[in-house]
Amino acid sequence: MTAKWEKQSGSLGVLTYEAPAEAFDKAVDQAFKKVVKTLNTPGFRKGKMPRAMFNKMYGEEALYQDALDILYQDTIEGAVVESGIEPIALDNIDVETLEKGKPVEFKITFVIEPDATLGEYKGLEYTAVETDVTDEDVDAELKTMQERGAELVVKEDGAIENGDTVVFDFAGFDGENQFDGGTAENYSLVIGSGNFIPGFEEQMVGLKSGEQKDIDVTFPEEYHEASLAGKPVVFKVTIHEIKAQELPELTDEFAKEMDEEVSSLDELKTKIRTRLENTRKQEADASMRDELVEAATKNATVDLPEVMVENEVERMVQEFTQRIQSQGIDLNMYFQLTGTTEEAMRTEMKEQAEERVKARLVLKQIVADEKIEVTEEEAQAELQSMSELYNIPADQLETMLAPQGGLDTLKGDLQFRKAIDVLVDNAKAK
């Protein structure tokens, strides 16, 4: 087989190759064996119709489309490997003639990654981020620690405030009728969390245990349940219990409970300050790198195939789904709680997907133009670093990475990191 790749406009190209006559004849035989199993022929058991009778009744040409599908599946992988291309999607399959005993010429139009035309990517400017840590920052971190160690104490007489955890019943009414999914008993909600429809939690503030109230809200226009979208409804709520956070005192004992490596509150404050400084420096570095990649991407020209953007949106949806599932929330529940839809989410993700795909192509072009390489030793060193970070043996980690391309994928990530290093080394603060 001789495969020939011819680049066309944009991200399209045509792969031409010829499958030998004997391969097509074999595919026709396979197609007959597949089709005959579905035929009931008088005088023969199902699937036992003779080939000669089939050809007489239907014509051998009736097998050609199935045979072509079989031949394509048997030959396309070898042709792609021989041509050296990495197709993203199939656009069209063209075969001019099909005749038994003759070779078959395939002309396959594929979508491939487009080349990025780089603009300015050296001498870019970035916004320097302040990394100093103040006493107020340390105090805020201590307050967060207090809240993590807080106990929920029942408020016997007090009214609901923001931050309180409330246990209550609710029933949603559209006019005189209750609607599905709008009713629950002994539901627990942190007021101010924003988990309910806008306006709901705010109207609970000030209520006391045992009290009831009708809460008027309007579902968002883009709400996933079309029958409720944009509709005003009433939730009848009954408050059962209100719990407020009781914060622990800031003492040396508190400090030791929060961090067994310190012996006093002052030591804890020092450790917090050091950690915040390191975190802010890392965040500042990440912000600078993101800003430079964004600028280099903006300066470049890339004709993005729609299929690449769609694939990226699909990846983003899967990532988001896995993230919320790890928090015990499925996608349908998320849409119900936030009043949005999957279609709206995908539309919102599309612009970000375009930027992500374009940025990858720009970095890939910088890797090519700068002739950036990653050695086997560098890849192994990165694998070892990941092993220590995730506390997983390096050989086990390499096995886990194998389905995603193993060390080759790791090398690609390191090439991108080095490409960003080129941007950083040639950039300056505004």
UniProtKB/Swiss-Prot annotation:
Disulfide bonds: none annotated. Keywords: Cell cycle, Cell division, Chaperone, Cytoplasm, Isomerase, Rotamase. Involved in protein export. Acts as a chaperone by maintaining the newly synthesized protein in an open conformation. Functions as a peptidyl-prolyl cis-trans isomerase. PROSITE patterns: FKBP_PPIASE (PS50059). Consists of 3 domains; the N-terminus binds the ribosome, the middle domain has PPIase activity, while the C-terminus has intrinsic chaperone activity on its own. Belongs to the FKBP-type PPIase family. Tig subfamily. It is found in: Cytoplasm. It comes from Exiguobacterium sibiricum (strain DSM 17290 / CCUG 55495 / CIP 109462 / JCM 13490 / 255-15). Coiled coil: none annotated. One of its GO terms (molecular function) is peptidyl-prolyl cis-trans isomerase activity. InterPro entries: PPIase_dom_sf, PPIase_FKBP_dom, Trig_fac, Trigger_fac_C, Trigger_fac_C_sf, Trigger_fac_ribosome-bd_bac, Trigger_fac_ribosome-bd_sf, Trigger_fact/SurA_dom_sf. One of its GO terms (biological process) is chaperone-mediated protein folding. One of its GO terms (cellular component) is cytoplasm. NCBIfam families: tig. This is Trigger factor. Residues 163-248 form the PPIase FKBP-type domain. It catalyses: [protein]-peptidylproline (omega=180) = [protein]-peptidylproline (omega=0). Its EC number is 5.2.1.8. It is an enzyme of class 5 (isomerase).
